[in-house]
Amino acid sequence: MSYSFTEKKRIRKSFAKRENVLEVPFLLATQIDSYAKFLQLENAFDKRTDDGLQAAFNSIFPIVSHNGYARLEFVHYTLGEPLFDIPECQLRGITYAAPLRARIRLVILDKEASKPTVKEVRENEVYMGEIPLMTPSGSFVINGTERVIVSQLHRSPGVFFEHDKGKTHSSGKLLFSARIIPYRGSWLDFEFDPKDLLYFRIDRRRKMPVTILLKALGYNNEQILDIFYDKETFYLSSNGVQTDLVAGRLKGETAKVDILDKEGNVLVAKGKRITAKNIRDITNAGLTRLDVEPESLLGKALAADLIDSETGEVLASANDEITEELLAKFDINGVKEITTLYINELDQGAYISNTLRTDETAGRQAARVAIYRMMRPGEPPTEEAVEQLFNRLFFSEDSYDLSRVGRMKFNTRTYEQKLSEAQQNSWYGRLLNETFAGAADKGGYVLSVEDIVASIATLVELRNGHGEVDDIDHLGNRRVRSVGELTENQFRSGLARVERAVKERLNQAESENLMPHDLINAKPVSAAIKEFFGSSQLSQFMDQTNPLSEVTHKRRVSALGPGGLTRERAGFEVRDVHPTHYGRVCPIETPEGPNIGLINSLSVYARTNDYGFLETPYRRVIDGKVTEEIDYLSAIEEGRYVIAQANADLDSDGNLIGDLVTCREKGETIMATPDRVQYMDVATGQVVSVAASLIPFLEHDDANRALMGANMQRQAVPCLRPEKPMVGTGIERSVAVDSATAIVARRGGVVEYVDANRVVVRVHDDEATAGEVGVDIYNLVKFTRSNQSTNINQRPAVKAGDVLQRGDLVADGASTDLGELALGQNMTIAFMPWNGYNYEDSILISEKVAADDRYTSIHIEELNVVARDTKLGAEDITRDIPNLSERMQNRLDESGIVYIGAEVEAGDVLVGKVTPKGETQLTPEEKLLRAIFGEKASDVKDTSLRMPTGMSGTVIDVQVFTREGIQRDKRAQSIIDSELKRYRLDLNDQLRIFDNDAFDRIERMIVGQKANGGPMKLAKGSEITTEYLAGLPSRHDWFDIRLTDEDLAKQLELIKVSLQQKREEADELYEIKKKKLTQGDELQPGVQKMVKVFIAIKRRLQAGDKMAGRHGNKGVVSRILPVEDMPYMADGRPVDIVLNPLGVPSRMNIGQILEVHLGWAAKGIGERIDRMLKEQRKAGELREFLNRLYNGSGKKEDLDALTDEEIIELASNLRKGASFASPVFDGAKESEIREMLNLAYPSDDPEVEKLGFNDSKTQITLYDGRSGEAFDRKVTVGVMHYLKLHHLVDEKMHARSTGPYSLVTQQPLGGKAQFGGQRFGEMEVWALEAYGAAYTLQEMLTVKSDDVNGRTKMYENIVKGEHKIDAGMPESFNVLVKEIRSLGLDIDLERY
């Protein structure tokens, strides 16, 4: 087994029992692939598929004019280069986007010609607005902030059949309904009412009988009945009435008359129920007709019009009920044969027949007019309007699109469903197999008449009791719309608006000699795109607290948003976990609160297929043997198979062991024999999301707590010094690398140069392209603000001379440690109560933890100030501010902007700004005098940017933006100069590195080669030596050497060209950078100048901060205790944190206890390794100890592949504690934890004996730090990875004396954002009244509230040392008096 450069440094001991079959896929693939498919930048113009932008253009173009003589055709589109790169866009507050240009062709036809003839073609590029580009990490920069487009889980287009579960009608009767949902266009609903009549609705409007729709489609009554019913023929004669015998219809019926065979024997007596045996006897007897009583005809419906063959008179119409009068009429007219509809109560209902009777429309046109009146009430139905509306509803590609998915879902649900034998022989089978044979193949993306009829027929068949309704929460009926598809829809809607405008102008195209760019105005397109990215419900401000929150946000799927559900209407079923979520959507990670179950996270291995359905990988099983083949199955496909779990036992050849295996089939858990198994899960963690799979021992936690654990990891604040978790799950590396927080090598090579800002790697010769200079430069991100104000800072993880492979770690980022996610710190924890300080989940923590800066985090705040052009004159950013103290002025430079590095506190001026005030406009003379004598103070007010209350920190950066045409101040100029200087240095360094690398390559390439001549009179045929090359005046003279080997000579020439190109590129880049910096900035209208100040704030851990473990065990720090008072062990080491043991049993998150035990073992092993290293033991002894650690149980590690130096480096990285991986559902067993504890704390070690372990080595004796006495019982002590969450007391709490108040109530505003106060309301007053605390109450209502005089006196009294209160009248009473007076009641308060 080969280890990468980073893995060698710290191998994580895994307890996994099963080998890794499938690597964790790239976690951001859903987002990145979806947008790449939308843009199709990689594909040549003619190779672009009908997706994304291409599909949007194709669906709108060609645009034809109203008269048909001009049309606009789309040729292809191109995307330009973005003007600014990502960091520049973030700094300037603009969108990272590229200009979109489409090549459009205007074709004008000859009006005079008899057949369509092209008269003229004009073609040019048309600017279509800007399209935001995705950053490499899957986010977008919109107006300077990083945003994420969340994928949407919506109902798939297609046809769905359901019932109301008996909730609509009081009788509990099931009312069936069907709905055809297109991708865009009108919804078509069919529904039964309690009387079993069938209705339809369009777009949830008024319902109408479904037969109106069928008539509008061109069917008459007879054809409608012919489609939906089997027939019965009755023969009328003087001897009575007979009917054709259909054996299948007799079963379960009661014989109305004796059924006799040809000899007259009774086969079934009158009044007896006909059984299956009776039917066999009747069939064997060869009977073809049965006698029936004439009365049984009454109430039956005629299948067709009955016409007198002689007179042509219509005796009865189709669907007429047979009455005695009708029978008499038949008798008179000599009718010998009548055909009726075959209807029975059981499985052939009279629904369509009854609906037809309620429908009074006659014929196709009347039906269409009725539909028009329902859709457009109040508008006159002209024939043309009626036809146009009806065709546009479902049959026009412009207004209706079922989509590829919708067509697939529709066909599988109607035409391609499996029919039972009875259905095959009924009207339904004939309809699908004969009448509509081939309809599925020719189905386009609009509805056909067959589609509508097939939907109605399937619904009627459902009501007849055949088939099952659909489960709308099944993931086969819900699909994912990712960022590419959502953007495409917005782009198409913008183009559709353009189309309407263009059609109007196309008629004038020829006469006015217009070009395509004159016709097309791209404003609607860019407006649609801007609106979507800026304010759509699915475009969200990226959660950037730590790398995990970034990854999770990009992998989120939401059922909310346009075209989705709303919180209020979503019921329990939609939110619930469904069996089809298995391996696709995480059953654990979802928000608590109103969005629970509506916002989900993709499982680790889930991906979307071409149709947008989620699929998950499975290993194929053939005849009980698990193969290496992996198939991705969607929820629809999965229902057809028997799937074993990932933890099923296998023998060495991969055969399933045991008589029965636990499997899943159609959403149920079953026990199946190995030969029935068709697939097997690929990994135990396949079910859960990334956040949930980071929780070790997840299988021992209650689901509710696991949910909290998964959610709270996303709120962990990056610590100053990240520390890898001792107990992890093995997926930490994937998250750190895929989030792009940690930098990995693009190509293998040797590290040439490292400093805090950049790492330079000289690429291996075999990975460098021939003739190209092989150098990779990694610029690191330093102290940058994230969306949540946390600090993003990358630190190099390599040193010069290190040899890297592709994919090796180059630099660590926020919350990563040696390329692994490190959200918190490993804390020594004791579970015991301590003087009530850990009551109700409070956390007692050692002062040492705070002093060592273990949980110190850096937060970066951005403060802005703008100088506007006001009516009274321009605002000015200046140092000259009226009444500013000397101390504050000293921090500002001559331009009035704070220095970098200044320590600032609340209220300090950061940027001095004055605004003109006064009513009058100044005359030019006055302006001149003011300018000469500088009388600024009188007519300006101080509107400087000050440090907000409750905030203090260090200024780390200042950026000044100035509008074009306005002179820059000195500070702005110096910022530009230093930026350019730094950039030039960077470029020079890069060139130097490229040069050195190139000449090193040349030297390796040409030394020892023969030359035909060269500088310094190099003789022909002589060999080139290192000394000769060193003796040349300049290395650039090497290019003048003429080599005999032509291939090498060509390579030398290529390198020369490449270096020249690099120099030119560097100069060009410098000029571009200079232009960007020196040209004016685009600012909002009216803004002359903008200054951004970045302040770094150090937040130490303090009481009131929220902390949590990974198992949902959260709490608030109640006290930071001096280290000497903390409980300590026998060897004098104090614990870091004391937690309440009562927080474990009721919460059922036992995973934290197992983590603590395994962490305790990890720490003990680290201490043993540390001791061995200090004693300078030999590498062999270390190797033996590490072998016991890594190869005792679980996954085996190949330590023999490491050299002695690498073993020593590995051991020194484990000094603080070993690294364990306990994968989800495949973690460490109790016996393995005990094994590790025994390895860490061997019983024969005197140090171990001193600690006073119990037998299982999970508890030790602790001593009270205050008294030095041992506690009565042994205490569970161990190591847990504990996090500090983003809910910091510094950001929650504030103090206020006076401040803003509400005009209406005259009371202070509420909340920190408004600098509000605390409201002592009605109920609080009642509480004090109930206690009889009269003086406290008086104090609360007067001197602590709005009794202004009382407050002043109280201050004076305290200063004098008199502790007394002089309470007066609170302002609230005056407000009350004023309000009563406003009612016209004069009221005065008398003072006593």
Swiss-Prot record:
GO cellular-component term (any): DNA-directed RNA polymerase complex
Residues annotated as transmembrane: none
GO biological process per UniProt: DNA-templated transcription
Keyword Transferase: yes
One GO MF term: DNA-directed RNA polymerase activity
Enzyme class: transferase
Catalytic activity reported: RNA(n) + a ribonucleoside 5'-triphosphate = RNA(n+1) + diphosphate
E.C. no: 2.7.7.6
NCBIfam families per UniProt: PRK00405.1, rpoB
Stated role: DNA-dependent RNA polymerase catalyzes the transcription of DNA into RNA using the four ribonucleoside triphosphates as substrates.
Stored PANTHER family: DNA-DIRECTED RNA POLYMERASE I SUBUNIT 2
UniProt protein name: DNA-directed RNA polymerase subunit beta
Biological source species: Neisseria meningitidis serogroup A / serotype 4A (strain DSM 15465 / Z2491)
